[in-house]
Amino acid sequence: MDIKLGKYKPVKEEYIKSFKDMLLLRRFEEKCGQLYGMGEIGGFCHLYIGQEAVISAVDMVKQKEDSMVTSYRDHAHIILAGTEPKYVLAELMGRATGCSKGKGGSMHLFDVPNKFYGGHGIVGAQVPIGTGLAFAEKYNGTNNICFTFLGDGAVNQGQVYEAFNMAALWGLPVVYIIENNEYSMGTSVARSTFMRDLYKKGESFGIKGFQLNGMDFEEMYDGVKQAAEYVRENSMPLILEVKTYRYRGHSMSDPAKYRSKEEVETYKERDPITEIRKIILENNYASEADLKEIEQSVKEIVKEAVEFSENSPLPNEEELYTQIYV
């Protein structure tokens, strides 16, 4: 099986939904950055600004019963999995109404009813978990698959390759999506990885891999749809490396001095939201007024999330003793 781009193209409604989804994620993350600067969000906080086309395309392709697991850069993933933004922001602000009851924070977001299994703070630790979720689907005889996200920094972790081996050996229905934003904290892929074509990392296990432009919603939609079909039909793992870019630092405490302003601006010129907006207008899928209305509705969602979170209580002391399993 080879992914030959051009097989699938989004329809009008999917373009419009993706525009709204990506814009919501952008505005939500911008607000998180603002609240962090004001001291309303504590701890670590990793923003997804610039990478929105990746999760938006996966959300379009993913079926309701498919599961997802990702790293600590997880705000966008849980929102598109179906969690209301207000419960995500409440979690970031440490409120009892948060999706993890105010105890997980930015890096440990969970929504099991929506098949979202985290948010994991240890680099690469989610990969064995995603592999296990795929094992459960196969064991239970479902036709569901697991989308397991990891960053370019995680590809050098030993547990990732143990998981790859098990997935190939047992024929597990998992799509490994490597979100290659070029920097593992402040270390570039070129400085940390000999094999820089990360989609080839599974070759020694017989796992097929492909590379996609993660800044291009149309290419992501096409490639992810074909990948999901392959995994679902063959019950075999597959690796997708998506070349993307984060506009902000690794986390809120990272000034990102290891890259130039010119480099960042080069990627911003390919901004996925700007591009999909252009496609929508050029094809008359929606008018300028329609898009302005979407933009206003997104502002209202973010505003509601802030008001809800600010007015939510902090967790009770009793919560220190709940959900403890070890």
From Swiss-Prot:
Keyword annotations of the record: Oxidoreductase, Pyruvate, Thiamine pyrophosphate
Keyword Oxidoreductase assigned: yes
EC number annotated for this UniProt entry: 1.2.4.1
Name of the top EC class for this enzyme: oxidoreductase
InterPro entries given in the database record: DH_E1, PDH_E1_Alpha_Subunit, Pyrv_DH_E1_asu_subgrp-y, THDP-binding
Names of required cofactors: thiamine diphosphate
Role of this protein: The pyruvate dehydrogenase complex catalyzes the overall conversion of pyruvate to acetyl-CoA and CO(2). It contains multiple copies of three enzymatic components: pyruvate dehydrogenase (E1), dihydrolipoamide acetyltransferase (E2) and lipoamide dehydrogenase (E3).
Name of this chain's protein: Pyruvate dehydrogenase E1 component subunit alpha
